[in-house]
């Protein structure tokens, strides 16, 4: 009875004391409940002495619940050991989801060895580590940071088999909108080039010079997920990452193609808005140029309807073709094909008119010759007038006398004139007629 009362009033300390006494004094297989009263009093004294020397232990002690079968030693629970990689190089789940990436297969859960070519980048851990990547939007990436507290070690002194940078590289800004992704990729590619990784990036004209190493791939994954949070990625980027979350190079290649496409779209729209045609070039060439522009814009997701396209074309017409602006002004259902049909018709008329003018055109020298000389087709003989002009100083009577004397004088010329006249109008100078000079 006394032993039962003792066990009810002091369950933990009495158990501990009994355990120590049993381990030292009781060496038989006798049941501990069948002990004498003297032994019970001795246990009570020892228990009182133990309580005065040891502090009260919590309920989560290593003593088992069965006080009758107490173990001679308290169990020691070993502390959790680190994984195969150092603890400071791993991220927990909460830290890995700072940028919104999925937990499974996250690049930050990969072991991150110190990347020698860019030593300022360590694996993203706590939120405080983001302070070493300030945002400098609109500035050059290779410009040193204005913050004096962020000083990075010189990577040129690092001895490694990888290429090291010779300058401090400024990180790209953090992406904040899906619409700015292509602009962000331009800065990110510049950042990789400044980090001596330009030879692993494909360009518009050539492929990558070499393949990246495992360390470089790890660096690419960490920097991409750090500066491009998943909630701000375009849908086509998320589709690529859903297949392979480490295929950053495919994202960069497709982004470069989209940049070229955007540049071509801007050039096509500019060309379409500044069209000019006056008939100096063939209508077929003009139609082919405009049709190719409209097809490229349509394939790139920028369709232009007939009404807008016709407005662009008519705005660029000049000269005689300007008339088509007013001829087609009130046509509601006008198409590009109809407008080019009118341009072709006007161009053919213009070319036909030029050909007709070239056949009927005569040179000014030929017209001058026709006005001065002629050919006598009825008579083989030609009459040539005397080019000698009479002397104006002589009187009219003297000049008439000279003419009459010239006509009466025999000579071959005078006979020629007589023979050439007709019979009814023969003139005889028998009455001494005085004719005025220049009347024959």
Swiss-Prot record:
The record marks 401-402 as: Cleavage. Induction: Ty1-MR1 is a weakly expressed element. Induced under amino acid starvation conditions by GCN4. Signal peptide: none annotated. GO terms for biological process: viral translational frameshifting. One of its GO terms (molecular function) is RNA binding. Its main location: cytoplasm. Residues 363-372 have a biased composition (Basic and acidic residues). Residues 1-31, 46-60, 137-168, 373-411 have a biased composition (Polar residues). Keywords: Cytoplasm, RNA-binding, Transposable element. Capsid protein (CA) is the structural component of the virus-like particle (VLP), forming the shell that encapsulates the retrotransposons dimeric RNA genome. The particles are assembled from trimer-clustered units and there are holes in the capsid shells that allow for the diffusion of macromolecules. CA also has nucleocapsid-like chaperone activity, promoting primer tRNA(i)-Met annealing to the multipartite primer-binding site (PBS), dimerization of Ty1 RNA and initiation of reverse transcription. Retrotransposons are mobile genetic entities that are able to replicate via an RNA intermediate and a reverse transcription step. In contrast to retroviruses, retrotransposons are non-infectious, lack an envelope and remain intracellular. Ty1 retrotransposons belong to the copia elements (pseudoviridae). The C-terminal RNA-binding region of CA is sufficient for all its nucleocapsid-like chaperone activities. Homotrimer. This is Transposon Ty1-MR1 Gag polyprotein. It comes from Saccharomyces cerevisiae (strain ATCC 204508 / S288c) (Baker's yeast). The gene is TY1A-MR1.
């Amino acid at each position: 009875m006394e032993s039962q009362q003792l066990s009810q009033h002091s369950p933990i300390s009495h158990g501990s004391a009994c355990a120590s006494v049993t381990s030292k004094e009781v060496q038989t297989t006798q049941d501990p409940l069948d002990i004498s009263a003297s032994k019970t009093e001795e246990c009570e004294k020892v228990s009182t002495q133990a309580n005065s020397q040891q502090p009260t232990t919590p309920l989560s002690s290593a003593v088992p619940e069965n006080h009758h079968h107490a173990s001679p030693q308290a169990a020691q629970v070993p502390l959790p050991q680190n994984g195969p990689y150092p603890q400071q190089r791993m991220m927990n789940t909460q830290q890995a989801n700072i940028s919104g990436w999925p937990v499974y297969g996250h690049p930050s859960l990969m072991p991150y060895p110190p990347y020698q070519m860019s030593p300022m980048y360590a694996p993203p851990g706590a939120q405080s580590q983001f302070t070493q990547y300030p945002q400098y939007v609109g500035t050059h990436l290779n410009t040193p940071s204005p913050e004096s507290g962020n000083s990075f070690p010189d990577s040129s002194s690092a001895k490694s088999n990888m290429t090291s940078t010779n300058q401090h590289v400024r990180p790209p800004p953090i992406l904040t909108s899906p619409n700015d992704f292509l602009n962000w990729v331009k800065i990110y590619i510049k950042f990789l080039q400044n980090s001596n990784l330009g030879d692993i990036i494909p360009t518009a004209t050539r492929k990558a010079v070499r393949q990246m190493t495992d360390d470089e791939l790890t660096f690419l994954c960490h920097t991409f997920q750090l500066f491009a949070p998943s909630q701000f990625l375009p849908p086509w980027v998320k589709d690529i990452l859903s297949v392979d979350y480490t295929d950053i190079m495919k994202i960069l290649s497709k982004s470069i193609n989209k940049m070229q496409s955007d540049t071509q779209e801007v050039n096509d729209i500019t060309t379409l808005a500044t069209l000019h045609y006056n008939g100096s070039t063939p209508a077929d060439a003009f139609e082919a140029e405009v049709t190719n522009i409209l097809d490229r814009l349509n394939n790139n997701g920028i369709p232009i309807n007939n009404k807008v396209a016709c407005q662009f074309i008519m705005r660029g017409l000049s000269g005689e073709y300007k008339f088509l602006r007013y001829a087609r002004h009130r046509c509601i259902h006008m198409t590009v094909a109809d407008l080019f049909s009118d341009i072709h018709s006007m161009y053919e008329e213009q070319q036909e008119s030029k050909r007709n003018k070239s056949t009927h055109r005569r040179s000014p020298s030929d017209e001058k010759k026709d006005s001065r000389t002629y050919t006598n087709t009825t008579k083989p003989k030609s009459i040539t007038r005397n080019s000698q002009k009479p002397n104006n100083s002589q009187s009219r009577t003297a000049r008439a006398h000279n003419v009459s004397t010239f006509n009466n004088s025999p000579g071959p010329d005078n006979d020629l004139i007589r023979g050439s006249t007709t019979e009814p109008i023969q003139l005889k100078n028998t009455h001494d007629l005085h004719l005025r000079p220049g009347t024959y």
